[in-house]
Amino acid sequence: MRYITAGESHGPQLTVILEGVPAGLTLAAEHINKELLRRQKGHGRGRRMQIETDTVEIVSGVRHGMTLGSPITLIVKNDDFKHWTKVMGAEPISEKESKEMKRTITKPRPGHADLNGAIKYGHRDIRNVLERSSARETTVRVAAGAVAKQILKELGVEIAGHVLEIGGVKAKHISNLSIEEIQIITENSPVRCLDKTVEQEMMDAIDNAKSSGDSIGGIVEVIAEGMPIGVGSYVHYDRKLDAKLAGAIMSINAFKGAEIGVGFEAARQPGSKVHDEILWDEEQGYTRKTNNAGGLEGGMTTGMPIVVRGVMKPIPTLYKPLASVDIDTKEAFQASIERSDSCAVPAAGVVAESVVAWELAHALVEQFGKDRMELIQQNITQHNKYAKEF
């Protein structure tokens, strides 16, 4: 499976085309809209989320609530486009009109794609860069992830995400929660945190950053349960599932780090305390005493829960802008200011769920049959029986 997205932040719409989704998957707009709404929530979100209503239109690949096996096209309209029709129009405009309506940007923002992208593509107007590099594009990545979550659900895999840290405020580790319990708790938290004792402190940190014109980042975690043993591969570097998951996390806007299981903590512990001892019983088959590997060894699933974390840096658009240089005059200026969030970590957690869900669904479809859901389900059932008796 693969997908490609298109569209600009203030353009008419965002589009994603999904290829390789098996036939026979139950899919309706409500499944996708639920995830889009989750992305819009979270303490620290900016005014843009008050403008957009983010609902999906399914325009191909689905008939009467069932996928056909052909490419699926999903569209999300940008409600804010009505205020940008001249600025973001596709048709040519005169030089006079250009000066009046283009809202040209020549002062790149540190931390964004602005300067590097302008140099790469030769854009003298940085708006041509920021419109596409904006995290608004993650709207349709979440839509794609919603489809992946439907695949996982029908294949017996559950997934949830939560926030571990915001602006230096850390949540306590809470273990032994089911995926459903994590989902319920986080959906009722304005910062998607499992630890209610630090929830207000996280919100205060966000509010303080906003009032000072600053921004803060954080850490999110995604957990998936129900993956069969042996999904992925040790044979080739580009088929290792942990590599794909780390790459997916790093592809999210403003994410600067990824870890699986205990992650970087493994460097501080001896091997005897890091590696997960193997157990077997007649009821469960092969299991592990611990899950420090985060459900992945040698590029393949172990059958234990997948645990992936991502680090999000503070959003680079600041209301007290940093020093920059005008690319036209080369004079020192403060960077341009665009409408932005003070903290998008809770929303980014939803995006992280989506990209992890896509990689897991892709791996299952690739390994157990590509064409139809019924066949994939049968193959996974047979594989699980085989692995248990191995």
Curated annotation (Swiss-Prot):
NADP(+) binds at R39, R45. This is Chorismate synthase 2. This reaction introduces a second double bond into the aromatic ring system. GO terms for molecular function: chorismate synthase activity; FMN binding. InterPro entries: Chorismate_synth, Chorismate_synth_AroC_sf, Chorismate_synthase_CS. Belongs to the chorismate synthase family. GO terms for biological process: amino acid biosynthetic process; aromatic amino acid family biosynthetic process; chorismate biosynthetic process. The keyword Flavoprotein applies. Keywords: Amino-acid biosynthesis, Aromatic amino acid biosynthesis, FAD, Flavoprotein, FMN, Lyase, NADP. It catalyses: 5-O-(1-carboxyvinyl)-3-phosphoshikimate = chorismate + phosphate. The lineage of its organism: Bacteria, Bacillati, Bacillota, Bacilli, Bacillales. GO terms for cellular component: cytosol. Reduced FMN (FMNH(2)). It comes from the Bacteria.
